[in-house]
């Protein structure tokens, strides 16, 4: 194998640039030519591909986002789009591909693998919702961003003696809400995987006030329902005044933490090593801090479950 391509797809996450840097430098170190594919699978179809040098990835390890840009491609879901992308790679003599993204990106990667192109997936999403890996690139940074926001909001919640509902990302997976709820000392955490009882949420708030609490923080994952609806429900049912903050896309941006830089660097280098070793149709997962290749089919056959121990712990510590 002499030429490898790399792309980022789907939602961006802090640490992707560290991964790209590792792919390029590890590849060049091993005597390979590395090609960057811009704008994800859309760029693959449109031929937005160029050779990357060591200098192409200088001064990016500390930057959020992705220098290769990203997108979601409906065209690549079609056989014609997949063939077009495959042909563009073959025309340039690219013999392997590294795809950085989430499960949707890996489904696109698997299609190319089935067409005969060696492909390795690297998990990158702030949702940390990919099965068969304990951590995905960007989750730690997003978690710290949410914690910083909680700390700041708690200051004003204390000053005004008020309830704040904070909506965080997590359409189908509540890991970001769950972990930030525990680390941020939230009074209640609502996630998509566990049905909530508003009466119990209100009871917990009132119990806190009886003990002398002057403010409360409720973390809600966007997949439960909009934070504004939760706030309205609390007001209508219990007459408790509250404010709602939607953190939105601020959770995706910003300087990656040391952890995400390390994780991205390790995963990127490992992806190159696997391609050179003849591996394909796999994602690199992490278990007990060790990197483990996992077949795409095993990733797709499972649903990421929340850590119920963390949920129980969060509940018990927020009394």
UniProtKB/Swiss-Prot annotation:
Catalysis: reaction(s): beta-D-fructose 6-phosphate + ATP = beta-D-fructose 1,6-bisphosphate + ADP + H(+)
Residue positions binding substrate: 125-127, 162, 169-171, 222, 243, 249-252
Catalytic residues (UniProt): 127 (proton acceptor)
Cofactor(s) demanded: Mg(2+)
Keyword Lipid biosynthesis: no
Coiled-coil regions listed: none
Binding site for ATP: 11, 72-73, 102-105
GO molecular function: 6-phosphofructokinase activity; AMP binding; ATP binding; fructose-6-phosphate binding; identical protein binding; metal ion binding; monosaccharide binding
Subcellular location: Cytoplasm
Pfam families assigned to the protein according to its UniProt record, in alphabetical order: PFK (PF00365)
Function as written in the Swiss-Prot or TrEMBL entry: Catalyzes the phosphorylation of D-fructose 6-phosphate to fructose 1,6-bisphosphate by ATP, the first committing step of glycolysis.
Full protein name: ATP-dependent 6-phosphofructokinase
Provenance organism: Natranaerobius thermophilus (strain ATCC BAA-1301 / DSM 18059 / JW/NM-WN-LF)
Gene: pfkA
């Amino acid at each position: 194998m002499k030429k490898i391509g790399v792309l980022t797809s789907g939602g961006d996450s802090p640490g992707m640039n560290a991964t790209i840097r590792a792919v390029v430098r590890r590849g060049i170190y091993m005597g390979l030519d590395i090609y960057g594919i811009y704008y994800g699978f859309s760029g693959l179809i449109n031929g937005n591909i160029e050779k990357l040098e060591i200098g192409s990835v200088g001064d990016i390890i500390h930057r959020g986002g992705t220098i290769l840009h990203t997108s979601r491609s409906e065209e690549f879901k079609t056989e014609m789009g997949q063939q077009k992308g495959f042909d563009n790679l073959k025309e340039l003599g690219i013999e392997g591909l590294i795809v950085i993204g989430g499960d949707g990106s890996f489904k696109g990667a698997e299609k190319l693998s089935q067409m005969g192109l060696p492909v390795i997936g690297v998990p990158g999403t702030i949702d940390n919702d990919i099965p068969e890996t304990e951590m995905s690139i960007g989750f730690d940074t997003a978690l710290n961003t949410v914690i910083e926001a909680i700390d700041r909001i708690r200051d004003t919640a204390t000053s005004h003696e008020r309830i704040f509902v904070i909506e965080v990302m997590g359409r189908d997976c509540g890991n970001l809400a769950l972990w930030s709820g525990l680390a941020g000392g939230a009074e209640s955490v609502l996630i998509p995987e566990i049905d909530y009882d508003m009466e119990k949420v209100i009871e917990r708030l009132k119990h806190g006030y009886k003990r002398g609490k002057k403010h409360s923080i409720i973390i809600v994952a966007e997949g439960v329902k909009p934070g504004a609806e939760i706030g309205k429900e609390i007001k209508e049912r219990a007459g408790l005044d509250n404010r709602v903050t939607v953190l939105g896309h601020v959770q995706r941006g910003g300087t990656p933490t040391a952890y995400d830089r390390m994780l991205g660097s390790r995963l990127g280098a490992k992806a190159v090593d696997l391609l050179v070793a003849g591996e394909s149709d796999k994602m690199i997962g992490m278990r007990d801090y060790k990197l483990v290749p996992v077949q795409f089919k095993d990733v797709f056959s499972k649903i990421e479950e929340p850590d119920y121990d963390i949920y129980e712990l969060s509940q018990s510590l927020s009394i």
